[in-house]
Amino acid sequence: YAVIPKNFDAEKPSALVTGGVHGYETSGVQGALQFIETKLAQYAEQVNIVVVPCVSPWGYESINRWNPMALDPNRSFYSDSPAPESAQLMQLVSDLALSLTLHIDLHETTDTDNSEFRPALAARDGVTHDNWNIPDGFYTVANTPSPQIEFQKAVIEAVKKVTHIAPADENGKIIGADVVSEGVICYDKKSLYLCGGM
């Protein structure tokens, strides 16, 4: 389901908040729900905000990264996507004719990435899995073509007030990507078909 404004105002910017694209990343779902309960009304005067708190409800209920067809919804944001979760979210954004100024896609990295989900993916795809350091702390993933580093830094500074920021590993990386600013890495979200690249 989605929480959408009663009346879209074309004069205001539009933002999308998503959680639970990977269902087992439960803090994204809980964070989106908490945002709805505690902050949405505060920002609704300035911004058209759409919140989809749980993109992959089956994954959330079954504590799973993938959907029942063993597809990763967060690698499936492309035309004619076989992942219904991804296709439905893209259709919602299209139906609402959202021109997004901001998209916050809430994720977390858990120990089960190394112990369960990444090894299963490697086995399915017939490739080798190397463990990567699971970061301890908050970090952001900027979009490589337009990283908006000053915005990322502002997010990091705000988050520092409530929790610690993930340090780089011994190779200067977080989840295998170069750290471009404290707690900030970049992915080309569109080419990876990520939710944040819509």
Question: Positions of the model-derived regions?
Answer:
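Short beta-strand-to-loop junctions in surface cap/lid or active-site-entrance loops
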Residues: 1-11
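Generic non-transmembrane alpha-helical segments
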Residues: 154-162
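Active-site-adjacent mobile loop/cap segments within catalytic or ligand-binding domains
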Residues: 169-198
